[in-house]
């Protein structure tokens, strides 16, 4: 049966709830029912329940990603072809008009388009910072995006800079603000002499996400201000390497004698509740194409310290609505943590200014409405 609205299949590699998956949820939600969406996730992804709770139909395919494991390398091409055929069949059975790849390393949509004899349209979202990826992979992915996709969406100007200047099929579409708005009371900056200052690091435990830098900086900052407390909150996505990374961080904190002031917790389903319980949000990632975590902190008005690692620099005005520190610069992180923790007036300024800034820059016309325009343009070319 034909759909009353055009159907877009969102293909996402997330095996758990990630920033990329949440960003798409925030973007597609306001576009229903004018455009219908169904998601395609890896088999066994824990993101399925979240999407189904939002009312989406979810399909699964056994995606295989390129990795250092020999078994994955051997399986990659055969499974890419098989999943491409399955995706083409799924699109045909569901009468889908468009496949939206939620990152450009997922090549399944291109294979599905090939098997459809060019009938399927493909839109590719670039959510990694390609400049930081192994170029032996990134360059072919870029070529495919520029030549095989009908539209390429970059989540920031930092990402857009990797693609050919002036390419008509490449544009920047920022991720939207939380679709449900604020559900909790407005954030209030608090502080008094000798009061604890709580620092939140909200990120999955993945190497490169910067928790190690935060812990190193906190060791020095805590010696300067014993009222500081640091909480790491995030999931491991069920991956052994992420579990090992968390254990390394916990062992490091214990070896430094900080187990009473540094805490480690699991995945937080409600970002707003988590963030509003703290005084400062930290994000010291080594590379971010955008950073939904930073955007959420700014939206809720929780003072932010972030590294200059790509996309975050576009999310706020450094020094006016947040602090931006050089990438991998632990002394600068220490200085920012100590100075902001001890300056309630500056935290209040950041809280007020950040809320205003993101609501203007990431208004619907610059985010999900622009995405809808891209869908319509691609569909109109059929």
Residues of each region from the PLM?
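Conserved acidic donor-binding segment of nucleotide-sugar-dependent glycosyltransferases
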Residues: 317-319, 323-330, 339-344
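Short hydrophobic beta-strand element within catalytic cores of glycosyltransferases
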Residues: 303-306
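A conserved mid-protein helix/loop that constitutes part of the nucleotide-sugar donor-binding site
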Residues: 18-26, 197, 206-223, 244, ...
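Short, structured helix-loop element that forms part of the nucleotide-activated donor/catalytic region
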Residues: 50, 231-259, 346
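Aromatic "clamp/platform" in nucleotide-sugar-dependent glycosyltransferases that forms part
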Residues: 267, 286
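N-terminal strand-loop element at the rim of the active site
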Residues: 10-18, 30-74, 159-162, 238, ...
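Conserved donor-binding/catalytic core segment of Leloir-type glycosyltransferases
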Residues: 8-9, 191-209, 215-218, 230-233
